[in-house]
């Protein structure tokens, strides 16, 4: 967080605890206010009290009731209205839970004015892992329409959920949409690229601790689980890929391939649904092999538990931009990794 602050990055906070952590980075309340958004549309009283004490930046509302809640405590920092936008096709859509419908925005604005609550702008989120990047353009247009009755400078929060694989395309789409906005409309554009920043920040290295024959290929157990670093699978609908690190004997013998066949990776817990991945084209593994899972920084450690008494893995920090040479001898990851559908949240 210190590095981010030094780089001029602001903080999108969801709770009182996150506000406390962010506030500790700043020398003055005014600097903290200018660098934060309390972006949870539904806040408990204790967190609102923390935000007022710390003098956070604006919060977010998506209902008349939330505006009334703020007015009751004499909230002074202003609010952004979170609007519901098209997030169909995103890996993690949010509009079923968050966001005001277009028809409800005028009522929120009217109630806010009558209660002395300043509306400072609009926020939206097209869903994490957005697959249709044109949704950003449509959401920006909707945000501008929602701002139409307002006067003075406004904030538009573009949301987050940016994936490393599509970030540059998403950024280009957003930039083109912003360029089309008349310069006479004074807007401060902000976004929440937390996933993008965190994704490549951490790799996971895990040993294979078990192997046995199954009805269709091998069944392997690794020293991690869905309840640990792979919580990104049920909660974030991730499909992690891995690389096997070659052992010294293979490197010396220049043996670069193993047989490929169907296989399943299970986690180490006593839960039978603790399945990490399955594939019809998985390289055969052996007990003692180490697997390298790149890009395991987003929604992994933060949601990990110690279920069944298994500890969280040791964290090793490095300033190197490339992996250590010992990690560079590996086999290609499996192709066509299947989604483990029975451990995912249901999709309506």
Predicted regions, residues:
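Acidic/histidine-enriched ion/cofactor-binding microenvironments in catalytic or ligand-binding pockets
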Residues: 73, 145, 151-153, 169-180, ...
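Solvent-exposed alpha-helices and their adjacent loops that cap or buttress functional pockets
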Residues: 29-30, 52-53, 72-74, 90, ...
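Short glycine/threonine-rich loop-to-helix capping motif typified by GTGT followed
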Residues: 132-138, 164-174, 199-206, 210, ...
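Charged (often Lys/Glu-rich) extended helix/loop segments that serve as interaction or gating elements
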Residues: 188-348
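Active-site-proximal beta-alpha core segment in soluble small-molecule metabolic enzymes
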Residues: 1-157, 167-168, 177-180
């Amino acid at each position: 967080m210190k590095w981010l602050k030094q780089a001029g990055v602001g903080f999108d906070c969801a709770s009182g605890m996150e506000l406390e952590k962010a506030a500790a980075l700043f020398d003055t309340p005014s600097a903290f206010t200018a660098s934060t958004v309390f972006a949870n549309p539904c806040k408990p009283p204790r967190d609102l009290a923390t935000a007022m004490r710390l003098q956070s930046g604006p919060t977010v509302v998506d209902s008349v009731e939330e505006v009334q809640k703020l007015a009751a405590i004499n909230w002074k920092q202003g609010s952004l209205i979170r609007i519901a936008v098209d997030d169909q096709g995103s890996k993690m859509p949010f509009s079923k839970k968050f966001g005001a419908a277009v028809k409800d925005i005028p009522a929120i604005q009217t109630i806010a004015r009558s209660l002395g609550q300043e509306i400072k702008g609009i926020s939206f989120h097209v869903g994490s892992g957005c697959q249709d990047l044109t949704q950003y353009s449509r959401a920006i247009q909707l945000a501008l329409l929602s701002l139409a009755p307002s006067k003075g400078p406004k904030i538009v929060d573009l949301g987050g959920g940016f994936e490393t694989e599509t970030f540059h395309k998403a950024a280009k789409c957003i930039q083109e949409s912003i360029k089309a906005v008349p310069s006479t409309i004074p807007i401060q554009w902000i976004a929440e690229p937390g996933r993008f920043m965190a994704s490549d920040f951490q790799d996971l290295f895990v040993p294979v601790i078990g192997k046995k024959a199954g009805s269709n290929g091998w069944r392997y157990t690794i020293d991690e689980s869905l309840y640990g670093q792979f919580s990104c699978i049920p909660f974030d609908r991730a499909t992690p890929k891995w690389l096997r690190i070659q052992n010294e004997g293979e490197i010396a013998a220049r043996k670069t391939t193993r047989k490929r066949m169907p296989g399943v990776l299970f986690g180490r817990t006593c839960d039978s649904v603790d399945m990490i991945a399955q594939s019809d084209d998985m390289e055969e593994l052996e007990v003692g092999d180490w697997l390298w899972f790149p890009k395991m920084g987003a929604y992994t450690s933060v949601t990990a538990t110690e279920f069944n008494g298994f500890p969280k893995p040791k964290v090793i920090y490095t300033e190197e931009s490339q992996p250590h040479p010992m990690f560079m001898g590996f086999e290609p990851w499996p192709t066509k990794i299947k989604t483990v559908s029975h451990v995912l949240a249901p999709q309506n």
